[in-house]
């Protein structure tokens, strides 16, 4: 299941450089797409989360995350992608 919010500038507008940031996790993967035009301010294009069910096999969960990230790449065509370092621990 994906949840998303869209910023004020869909696609970032002409001349924008888009960057996709990903905060990975098997239960919840967060993401954000930001745009920067020239030396101007950075603006939010879209952000959200991809949630997977704990009872679902890992392979299926990874597939759901893959499909969601692939859709983001197709929709926004970012110039760069940044993935936060993964760590394992208990909350």
Report each predicted region and the residues it spans.
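Phosphate- and other anionic-substrate recognition elements at nucleic-acid/protein interfaces
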Residues: 1-91
